[in-house]
C-alpha cells in the first residue's frame, strides 16, 4: 500500500514548435528577395500581398532544404506532399490565410538526440517538420498613441516548422533541445537561426502531470507560450508556467479536457506569462488544400541528392575530435559549436601535429579576438596555415608559450608569419646552457626571501623565481629547462 508520502512531485510535459526561416535567395512563392531588414514594405509584390488574380509559384529550394533538414532529424520523407490554406484574420496576414501544410507534411516521424550534463543521451521524437510561409511583422509604437504599423517584408518568407512530441520533461531539456536543433540547422546551412532577427522562433506547449494519492495522475490544461525571444526566456517562461499551473490546479482542480487549451505570452520585463486567448482548434483554421499549387511528388533521386548534402553533424564531429586529436570533450564541444570554427581548427591541424596546442590557440587567442571585435571566424584575418606555423614554433620548442602570445599579437598587427617574426626579432628560446645557469643563479641570489619560502614548502615561491627568469630573458628561457635548473640549485 502506498501512502501520501509516496506521492511523486508534479512534473511537466513539454512539446516545442520551432519555426526557422530558410536562407533561400527569394521567398517561398514569389521572386521577392528573402532578406532581413530593409525599408518597411520594400520587398513585397502582388503575390506575397495576396492581390486578386496573383498565383503562387513554389520555390524548389524550399523543398530541398526541408528534405535536408528531415535527413538531419532522422525523419521519414514524404513521397507525396501538398500545401494547405490555414485561414485566419490578422493585420500581418494580408491574404487572410497562410500557405502551410496540414495532413501531408514533407517530413515526419523523426527524432533529435540531446546530451545531458551527465553524458547520457535522450531522444526527443519529432512529430513532423513542414513547409509554410511567414507572416508580416507588427510594430507597436510606444509613444502613447497606441498606433501600430505593419511591415510586410517578411510576408511569404519560407519557414520550416519543426514540431516535437511532448517528450521534454524540464525547462533545461527544452533549452538543450533548442540549442541542439539550432546547431544542426546552422551546420547544414539552411538557416542562420538568429533569434533577435526572428529567423528562429519558438512556441512551447506545456502542461503539468499531477500525481494523485491513488497512484494515478491528472493533466492540467495545456498552455501554449509565445513571445520567447531567447533561450533564457524559454527557460524562465517554462519555470514560471510550471509553478502557475500547479497553483491554479490547487485552487480550481481544473484538468485538461481537450478543449481548454490557452495561449499565453511571456512578459520578459515582469518574468510572467500572461493570458492572451483561448487556443484555437484545428477546425477553427478551416484548413483546405491550396487550390493554386499542385501536389508535389518527391522522387527517390531528389531525396538521395539531399542526403548527399548532409555534412558531418555536431555530435559525431565532437566524438571524432576527441578520438582523432586527443583534445578534451569540453574543447571538442566548443570547437564544434560552429561548423566554420570546426573547419578552421581542422585546417590548422592539417599543418601541425601539436593538436592540443592548436586547440588552445584557437579557443583562447583567436576566440578572444572574435569576441572582442564581434566578428566570425570567416572574418578573422590570419589564415589557418599561419596559425599552424605559430603552433609548430611552440611545439618544436623554438619559442615558449609566453613568447607565443606576443608573436600572435604581432601576427595580428602586421600580417607576417610566426617564423618571420621570430627570426626578425630574435625571439627564439635560449639554447646556451651556461648563460641560462648564470641567469638562474643571479635570480636566486637576488631573492633570498623567495628562496626561504621555497624551502618552507610554499609553491608560489618557485613560480615567482621562474617569473623573474622569464622577465630577465624577455620570455626566451625554456620554461622546462629553467624550472629544472632552479630546482637543482635550490636543493
Where are these regions (language model features)?
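Basic, nucleic-acid-interacting segments
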Residues: 2-312, 323, 329, 350-354
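Structural motif
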Residues: 8, 326, 349-358, 396-399, ...
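Amphipathic alpha-helical core segments of compact helical bundles
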Residues: 23, 209, 243, 342, ...
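Core structural elements
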Residues: 198-211, 322-346, 355-373, 385, ...
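M16/insulysin-pitrilysin zinc metalloprotease superfamily fold
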Residues: 351-352, 358, 366-381, 389-394, ...
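Strongly charged, low-complexity linkers/loops
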Residues: 377-388, 392, 401-471
Amino acid at each position: 500500500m502506498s501512502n501520501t508520502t509516496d506521492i511523486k512531485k508534479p512534473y511537466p510535459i513539454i512539446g516545442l514548435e520551432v519555426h526557422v526561416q530558410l536562407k533561400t535567395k527569394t521567398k517561398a512563392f514569389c521572386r521577392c528577395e528573402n532578406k532581413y531588414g530593409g525599408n518597411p514594405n520594400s520587398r513585397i509584390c502582388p503575390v506575397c500581398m495576396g492581390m486578386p488574380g496573383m498565383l503562387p509559384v513554389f520555390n524548389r529550394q524550399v523543398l530541398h532544404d526541408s528534405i535536408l533538414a528531415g535527413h538531419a532529424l532522422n525523419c521519414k520523407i514524404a513521397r507525396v506532399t501538398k500545401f494547405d490554406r490555414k485561414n485566419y484574420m490578422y493585420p500581418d496576414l494580408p491574404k487572410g490565410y497562410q500557405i502551410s501544410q496540414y495532413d501531408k507534411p514533407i517530413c515526419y516521424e523523426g527524432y533529435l538526440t540531446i546530451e545531458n550534463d551527465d553524458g547520457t543521451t535522450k531522444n526527443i521524437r519529432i512529430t513532423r517538420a513542414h513547409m509554410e510561409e511567414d507572416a508580416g511583422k507588427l510594430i507597436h509604437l510606444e509613444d502613447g498613441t497606441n498606433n501600430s504599423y505593419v511591415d510586410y517584408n517578411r510576408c511569404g518568407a519560407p519557414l520550416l516548422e519543426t514540431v516535437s512530441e511532448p517528450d521534454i520533461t524540464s525547462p533545461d531539456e527544452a533549452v538543450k533541445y533548442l540549442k541542439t536543433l539550432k546547431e544542426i540547422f546552422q551546420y547544414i546551412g539552411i538557416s542562420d537561426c538568429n533569434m533577435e532577427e526572428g529567423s528562429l522562433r519558438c512556441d512551447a506547449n506545456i502542461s503539468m502531470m499531477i500525481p494523485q494519492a491513488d497512484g494515478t495522475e491528472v493533466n492540467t490544461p495545456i498552455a501554449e507560450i509565445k513571445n520567447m525571444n531567447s533561450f533564457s526566456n524559454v527557460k524562465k517562461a517554462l519555470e514560471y508556467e510550471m509553478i502557475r499551473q500547479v497553483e491554479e490546479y490547487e485552487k480550481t482542480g481544473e484538468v485538461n479536457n481537450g478543449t481548454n487549451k490557452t495561449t499565453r505570452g511571456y512578459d520578459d520585463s515582469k518574468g510572467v506569462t500572461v493570458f492572451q486567448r483561448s487556443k484555437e482548434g484545428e477546425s477553427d483554421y478551416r484548413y483546405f488544400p491550396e487550390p493554386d499549387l499542385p501536389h508535389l511528388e518527391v522522387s527517390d533521386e531528389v531525396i538521395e541528392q539531399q542526403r548527399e548534402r548532409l555534412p558531418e553533424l555536431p555530435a559525431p564531429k565532437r566524438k571524432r575530435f576527441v578520438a582523432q586529436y586527443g583534445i578534451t570533450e569540453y574543447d571538442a564541444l566548443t570547437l564544434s559549436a560552429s561548423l566554420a570554427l570546426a573547419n578552421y581548427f581542422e585546417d590548422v591541424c592539417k599543418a601541425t601535429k601539436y593538436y592540443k596546442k592548436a586547440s588552445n590557440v584557437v579557443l583562447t587567442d583567436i576566440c578572444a579576438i572574435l569576441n572582442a571585435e564581434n566578428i566570425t571566424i570567416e572574418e578573422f584575418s590570419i589564415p589557418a596555415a599561419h596559425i599552424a606555423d605559430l603552433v609548430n614554433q611552440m611545439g618544436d620548442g623554438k619559442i615558449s608559450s609566453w613568447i607565443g602570445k606576443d608573436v600572435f599579437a604581432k601576427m595580428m598587427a602586421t600580417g607576417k608569419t610566426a617564423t618571420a617574426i621570430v627570426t626578425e626579432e630574435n625571439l627564439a628560446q635560449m639554447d646556451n646552457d651556461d648563460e641560462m645557469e648564470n641567469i638562474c643563479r643571479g635570480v636566486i641570489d637576488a631573492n633570498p626571501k623567495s628562496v626561504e619560502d621555497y624551502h618552507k614548502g610554499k609553491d608560489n615561491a618557485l613560480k615567482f623565481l621562474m617569473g623573474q627568469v622569464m622577465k630577465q630573458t624577455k620570455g626566451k628561457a625554456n620554461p622546462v629547462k629553467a624550472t629544472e635548473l632552479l630546482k637543482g640549485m635550490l636543493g
